[in-house]
Amino acid sequence: VEGAAYAKFVKITDLLQFRGGSLRMDLSEPSVSTYLRFGYTMAIPEGTTFVENGWYYKRVTVSSPDDVRFVAYNNAMNNDGTVTANLVFNNVKTSLYKANFTEKAFVKYVTADGTTVEAVESVYQSRSVSEVADAILKHPMASKAEKEYANNIKAAIQ
C-alpha cells in the first residue's frame, strides 16, 4: 500500500472533561474521614480503540516531584459512547481536610494505523475536602443532608 497519512489533531477538551470535585457521603463519618472524588467524562476519537484511562496524581503526605500513575478500573459506559470515570481518594482523615489533592486525567487509545496515543490534561486539577464542602454549602440545589454533611466536614477541621 502506498500513500500518505496525516495526523489528526484532537482537542484534549474533546477527550477529557473535568466535572468537578465531590464527596462520597455513604462510606464514612465526616468527623473521622471522608472520600474525595474527582469526576470526569472521557471519550476517544471515532475509529480508534480504547486501551485505558486513569490519572496522574501527587502524593499529599509525601513530598515528591514524581506523579503516581493510577489506571481506572470502574468506568461507567454512557449511552453516548463516553465514559464516566472518578478518581476517589479514600479515607481522607480530618487532618488532611485542608490539603490540596492534585491530579490530571489521561486516556490512552490506538489509532487505525496502530499508533498508541496517551492524551493527558495539560494542567492539574486541585481540590481540598474543605473547598468541596464550601461549594456544597453555597450551592442552591444541595439537599439538607448534603449541607449537613458539609457542615460536619467544616466542624471537623482543626
Where would I find each of the regions flagged by the language model?
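Short, surface-exposed linear motifs at loops/turns and structural transition points
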Residues: 12-158
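Conserved "repeat-terminator" motif of extracellular CCP/Sushi domains
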Residues: 1-12
